[in-house]
């Protein structure tokens, strides 16, 4: 068999196998690759890796869970939607200037990511500055960052770009 015939057959066979096992499905304005019955957010995966490659997180601080800011965040969250929010535990806390981003876990509620602003009167939770629950089938990082950027446009873009989800429940 000639080489060009073998190469053509190999390409056609490969395309046939891909066509039989991989589909593209649209959902809420996004296209997902579907293989083995599971949706994969290829665009989100690329966006997440692009974000990790190009972001500069030198202005963002990682705060410890026993910092004074962490105590204020937990106190504010406990009062936000009692009684279930009273058992919040801080998974991750980041700060840029007077803005904070917290990832929280709860015993009874879905995990959440909140954006808060510190001021002279104390910590405040801006209106709609919360993501809660799973992002499936979307890639969690880009989906949560995009949501928070739309809901709290005054929050620093660098703070949002430097957030990477930790809690498995967000995936």
What are these regions (language model features)?
Residues 55-88:
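Short, non-transmembrane alpha-helical segments in secretory-pathway proteins
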Residues 31-39, 70, 74-82, 92-96, ...:
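Terminus-proximal functional modules
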Residues 111-131:
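A short, surface-exposed beta-strand/turn
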Residues 3-23:
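Hydrophobic membrane-insertion alpha-helices, especially the h-region
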Residues 42-61:
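Short extracytoplasmic
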Residues 43, 67, 130-171:
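C-terminal partner/receptor-binding element of secreted or periplasmic proteins
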Residues 22-47:
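Ser/Thr/Pro/Gly-rich low-complexity linker/stalk segments immediately outside membranes or between
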Residues 88-118:
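Exposed beta-strand-loop-beta-strand "reactive/processing" segments of non-cytosolic proteins
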């Amino acid at each position: 068999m000639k080489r060009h015939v073998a190469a053509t057959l190999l390409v056609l066979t490969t395309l046939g196998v891909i066509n039989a096992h991989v589909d593209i499905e649209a959902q809420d304005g996004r296209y997902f690759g579907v293989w083995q019955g599971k949706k994969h957010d290829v665009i989100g995966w690329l966006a997440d890796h692009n974000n990790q490659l190009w972001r500069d997180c030198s202005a963002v601080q990682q705060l410890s869970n026993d910092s004074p800011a962490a105590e204020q965040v937990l106190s504010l969250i406990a009062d936000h939607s009692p009684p279930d929010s009273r058992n919040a535990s801080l998974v991750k806390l980041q700060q840029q200037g007077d803005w904070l981003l917290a990832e929280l876990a709860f015993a009874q509620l879905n995990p959440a990511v909140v954006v808060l602003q510190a001021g002279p009167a104390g910590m405040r939770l801006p209106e709609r500055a919360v993501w809660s629950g799973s992002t499936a089938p979307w890639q969690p990082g880009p989906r949560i960052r995009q949501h928070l950027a739309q809901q709290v446009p005054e929050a620093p873009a660098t703070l949002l770009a430097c957030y990477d989800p930790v809690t498995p429940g967000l995936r």
